[in-house]
Amino acid sequence: GLGDVYKRQAQRALSIMLNIKWKSNYFESIDPVEARRILDEELFGMESVKQRIIETVIQINRTHTLPAYGILLVGPAGTGKSQIAYLVAKILKMPWTTLDMSSINDAEQLTGSSRIYSNAKPGIIMEAFNMAGESNLVFIINELDKATSSNGNANPADVLLTLLDNLGFTDNYMECLIPTSGVYPIATANDKDKISAPLLSRFAVIDIPDYTREEKKTIFLKYSLPKVLKRIGLHENECLVLDDGLDAVLDYCKDTTGISC
């Protein structure tokens, strides 16, 4: 009967809570030299972006807590915003999860459903804590500027506010307040003007400029090509790229921002 269903769901909620290691929000120091090495190894140029990330590391080392504000990376498509987000998670030595706001159009996807329903389940956010097995977690929020509701239901952007305000997050399935002091959000967006003011106020904005033609050439030869060759099992001396060939590729992709062509 309904009682058995509710009992099973209550047991599941309890097992999820017991599975998560609830950590203190004391944060160990991060080596800024190692952080810089990680950034330089994966990112070409972007000096101002790297500097902002190192400043965040220094702030963490000073306070031994995560900053009150997350990072919002704003720029055209293909400029490496998601890659930067993953690198920050790597530098912080924290597990990470992604929320793709372009595919979330109903707040219940984030908050879960009430246990009064037989098909009830926790929301994406609670499942992320469960998968990570700990409460210190980087949330990489892709396309924050798409965090709106398209079908009249509660706005997912409002739910994100409760995740980011450090007062605790309520999942309808769990029926209790989830501590969020160990949550660090890193969001990406193409257009910050489409993000609500309350949500925008939770982030330090870092602008990611598009690459120049010369920068795209360097990135292709020194970063993209070696990675592709390694993936398909070729040595660099087995693939010769002529200047004319590279120019032809860039001309073909001239209407595309970034390097995602």
Go through the PLM ranges and name each one.
Residues 2-6:
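Short, small-residue-biased leader/transition segments that mark boundaries at the very start
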Residues 15-19, 23, 30-74:
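Pre-Walker A (pre-P-loop) alpha-helix and adjacent loop at the N terminus of AAA/AAA+ ATPase modules
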Residues 24-25, 133, 191-201, 205, ...:
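Conserved C-terminal "switch" segment of AAA+ ATPases
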Residues 69-101, 130:
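Walker A/P-loop
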Residues 75, 112, 143:
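The Walker A (P-loop) glycine that initiates the GxxxxGKT/S ATP-binding motif of P-loop NTPases
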Residues 91-120, 128:
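AAA+/P-loop NTPase substrate/partner-engagement loops
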Residues 132-140, 171-189, 237-244:
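AAA+/SF3 P-loop NTPase mechanochemical coupling elements
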Residues 143-179:
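Conserved catalytic/switch belt of AAA+ P-loop NTPases
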